[in-house]
Amino acid sequence: MSKKPNKKQAGAAVHCAHDRLALVTELRPHPKNPNQHPPEQVALLAKIIAHQGWRAPVVVSKRSGFIVAGHGRLAAAVALGLERVPVNDQEFESDADELAHLAADNRIGELAETDGALLKDLLLELDTGAFDMDLSGFDAGELERVINSF
């Protein structure tokens, strides 16, 4: 995997390590992907990618050729009209290993526990009036709830 920092591709900087820049039209979403990406999530992710560039590549299995991580990032790239996305091609020992990674990729993040006080401090530090708070991933109602809860 190579590091190609700050390389612009169709309007989004690439800051993550990746093997290649693939055409979005050549990438194949995994037919067994259980995660759905609602329009609101895709729009928010697109806004973050447009502002910050790519911080994580789309992961493609060398075994099947399907995406195993990054379906939402691909949807955001399509929404932005990007032609190419950074891709990390990975080997999987078996179909079962590939499917387990597909399932675990998002599930592991869901199992994290949030320290509300630290989150509040972090969000208050960002909220200077000069920063677009949408880029934190929280909408105005969620921000208010977090700040008032801790």
Locations of the language-model features?
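Short, charged/polar connector segments at secondary-structure boundaries
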Residues: 1-150
